[in-house]
């Protein structure tokens, strides 16, 4: 130990050297007044090396830990020609067991390369979901494959409710026994209907029913008289209209192109009444009707 009661004086240089040699701990504290920081742990570079080493070990560990199952014949594997792999049963079942599914990062990196080890002949036909249809979704979500099957079922139901697509191709209408009607009978029936519609209370019609639908409506109106004594309508042909009858009686030549029309009266009575009726119709056309007070001579 160093004692302060030495006889050496502090003023000499030699005495200072002797004192420093006797007390080495005192020199560390007085070495420029700096304190050395103690070491607290590994540095950043060492920590980075340790992290990279652990990551490299974790990537190589699944290939050594998980051994492939034995190739013993299980009841789920069916007899097939060629090599049979144990994964084919899981593909057909639609799900993998939990021990065969690798961790998430490894599965994301290696799922493309792992497909090359499986033969294409043992793979079943993939549906619309592709490879990911065999992975079970979480409990809070539903698989997209279920949505596809529901959509197909709804299409079948809707197509069953709409049978007209198939009726156009397969259904044939049943044709019953048809009756043929001669053309002459149709014409006489249409004449009867026209006469019934156009016969007035006085027994006269407005104009010739044969020329009702004809486009040449410029000809003057003619009269047809109904004979109530006859049970069935008997048509008599008249040679000319009112103007041609007047021309014949006056001695002038009438044209040869005759337009026939029909009447219910015999020929003798028809000629007598045509003379009186032709003048009366001309005058009535321009007279006023006293019942309604309408002047027919006014033209719009």
From Swiss-Prot:
> Where are stretches of biased composition, namely Basic residues?
25-39
Locus of motif EAR: 294-300
The terms under GO molecular function for this entry are: DNA-binding transcription factor activity
Provide the leader sequence positions: none
Question: In which residue ranges is the amino acid composition biased (Polar residues)?
Answer: 1-10
Q: Which domain of life is it from?
A: Eukaryota
Q: Which UniProt keywords apply?
A: Repressor, Transcription, Transcription regulation
Tissue-specificity statement: Expressed in leaves.
Region described as Disordered: 1-45
| Stored InterPro entries | SPEAR (IPR040356)
GO-annotated biological processes: leaf development; negative regulation of DNA-templated transcription
Motif range (SPL): 40-48
The miscellaneous annotation reads: Knock down expression of SPEAR2/TIE4 and SPEAR4/TIE3 by RNAi in a SPEAR3/TIE1 null mutant produces lines displaying epinastic leaves.
Instruction: Note the subunit structure.
Output: Interacts with SPL and SPEAR2.
Q: What does this protein do?
A: Adapter-like transcriptional repressor recruiting TPL/TPR coepressors to inhibit TCP transcription factors. May be involved in leaf development.
Q: Which protein are we looking at?
A: Protein SPEAR4
Origin species, per record, is: Arabidopsis thaliana (Mouse-ear cress)
